[in-house]
Amino acid sequence: MRYLILFVVLPLFATDNWPQWRGPNRDGAAPAFRGPAAWPEKLQTKWKITVGEGHSSPIFGEGRIFQFARLDGRETLSAIDPASGKVLWTQSYDAPFTMNVAAWGHGKGPKSTPVYAGGRVFTFGISGILSAHSAADGKLIWRKEFAKTFKNTSPDFGVAMSPIVWEGLLIAHAGGDKGGALTAFDVATGDEKWRWTGDGPAYASPVVGVFEDVPHLITFSQKSVMAVHPKTGQLLWQMNYQTPWENNNITPLLVNGTLILSGLDAGVKAVKPLLRNGAWVCETMWETKNASFSMNTPVLARNGLVIGFSHKNKGQIVAIDPKTGAIEWSGKPRQGDNAAIVMGAGVVLVFTTESEMTVLREDAKKYEPLRVYTVADSPVWAHPLPLESGIVVKDAKSLALLGW
């Protein structure tokens, strides 16, 4: 099988490059991250500013940080100088939202992470407002609201999927549990180019990979995992995949021609898309119930193991052999509700909702942390932004650059 991961944004334009959800290839890998020669006893806070509430993760493009958050009741996009923490510009709009009582503790968002491409920053608000801004000055280029298109403009717990840019198209899954559409828009104009209406949106974000020379946009939907051709929206394949409360929420991980899938109480499985007699099918390679990932997505470490944070045992770091599904090692239990995982400079960094960052060797053969740091004084749900100069951490309301 011919397979590759497709780069979905512009190539590296500077040393630091983290333009979207989970980095340049949406896989948690930070090629520009350097890290210290030796991890110190404590990290230094170089700057810290108030940016607002929400789980949206910071991104980096055009030499600046972009943070999407809720500030004074308005969804606010801020551009921030990475050296000083100075806010360069902000753009905001009123964003009233009533959170489902089952997720009250998560606040009113936003949860979706922006994407930077071609001088534009795209945001997707918790109630389903999709916007394109100039990265230079924040000027609004275009905006889409879907109240006239769908009965609900967001899933039960609010929009959490992070849009993706592919070959001049911004692709987002709009709508809610009563119907939605995976839709492609022209990045410059916002004109709709295609839509797929086979299922409502999940809380998960897509990736793009190429199988048998055919690009696949792969994502979870409300009740399935599926792939469409990103140029046309043509459905290539779809598998039933349902979790409690219709809460599909992880990003599929591409590993050597297979997809690592998981969800709340769903275990972990590997499936392989195959083209047979002109039709696409997905063959299950293995499945394990010994771990399960929810509200976090694993990474593929340098030693070939998949490192993730299982919600079993009340939160536990695990390493899985992607060829067999065997758990090679696991960390201590009771580590938190969720974790954000990135890797680079020979280490895997695991950020838990308990505000801890565990530093592991990327080639570790057992759970043996190099360091464990407290990185915030409030819960951390957003993914960190790894830069050459340090790590940017978003907690409940603040954004901070931690260095060494």
For every predicted segment, state its role.
Residues 14-404:
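Noncatalytic, solvent-exposed loop/strand surfaces
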Residues 3-12:
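Sec-dependent N-terminal signal peptides
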